[in-house]
């Protein structure tokens, strides 16, 4: 939701400002990486509000660097690896840091709760990435572009930005612990839905042959 409906306009203006000033996409990605580390450290210390500022800044810059690369035609293999590598690796570290920071913020969990919540989030994160890889390899397309409902689901599924919305909302009501529990529950629910989605797609391919994106039929 944030990437599609909130960031496009400010990212457009940021790109238009940066492009003629010699700012490269890799420079933007580097700043985003710094924001990622700062968010992790602040979450770990229980400074959730400050951490969220840097986390949301990172998500914004993650949008800007791609637009800047396309606008200036300066994309590179290294830049692509750098950008996507950060995107792939950092979310689990944020969730772990948030969980560990709850104690410093006065919301300590017992060990059982900690591991159930973190296990659900990290397990769901890894399995969802595997589902995505299976879809690309066996179906020949990314699952979220198969049907309109899949594209819509992509906007709210348990990925970084929707999860940040849950964490931000929980902080606004003064219960950052509830936010991470909400992320765990939403991750498990989305994992089940993604599993059903993948099974439907595999069955459709066996029945109909090669699948195509609904976008190509428009």
Where are the language model's segments positioned?
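Membrane-embedded alpha-helical segments that form the functional core of polytopic membrane enzymes
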Residues: 26-78
